[in-house]
A protein has these predicted regions:
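Generic N-terminal amphipathic, Lys/Arg-enriched alpha-helix
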Residues: 2-17
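N-terminal and secondary-structure boundary signal
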Residues: 15-18, 36-40
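Alpha/propeptide regions of enzymes that mature by internal proteolysis
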Residues: 32, 85-86, 92-110
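Active-site cofactor/substrate anionic-group-binding motifs, chiefly glycine-
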Residues: 45-96
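Solvent-exposed alpha-helices and their adjacent loops that cap or buttress functional pockets
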Residues: 67-70, 99-101, 126, 149-153
Length: 157
């Protein structure tokens, strides 16, 4: 399937699930990018999960995202249970803005969901000639050595 047709179909799906045009565009772009990078677990394979979470009201399709400036370098974002791509996209843009102004851009995001590959956001900072450290939390999936109960997520931190 051609990229333009796939993007059009994805946008239609997200719009049907009540995302704004801008948010549908953001989500479609990141899903396609994951497929191009052959990160299948973060691409189209996740589409049903996102749609199911919207239907279950776990993801808010019309979030009222709030950015709070803590200082010139630090911002805090309440993503209002947005789809993760949207909260993270706003977050990296804010971090870049802060870093260009002060040399450091630190952004914490709460009430967001699965956001795909961290590299999506890190690449934007690198393209702006900035160093970046981008990470997220993850549910307990791995047990410490010798333990029976999962404690660690599969994220690097």
């Amino acid at each position: 399937m051609k990229k333009s047709l796939l993007k059009s179909k994805l946008k239609q799906i997200f719009l049907k699930h009540k995302l704004s045009k801008n948010h549908a565009e953001i989500c479609s772009n990141y899903l396609i990018k994951a497929e191009i990078l052959e990160a299948k677990g973060h691409g189209l394979a996740r589409l049903k999960m996102y749609c199911d979470r919207i239907k279950a009201k776990v993801i808010n399709p019309k979030p009222k995202i709030k950015i709070k400036k803590i200082s010139s370098s630090i911002s805090y974002i309440n993503a209002d249970n947005s789809i993760g791509f949207v909260g993270a996209d706003i977050g990296i843009k804010q971090a870049i803005k802060n870093a260009k102004k002060t040399g450091i851009g630190l952004v914490a995001i709460k009430k967001s969901g699965h956001y795909g590959l961290s590299s999506f956001y890190a690449e934007q900072a690198v393209n702006n000639k900035l160093m970046v450290f981008c990470f997220t939390n993850a549910p307990a999936a791995l047990a410490p050595h010798g333990a029976k109960k999962s404690l660690f997520g599969t994220n690097p931190i």
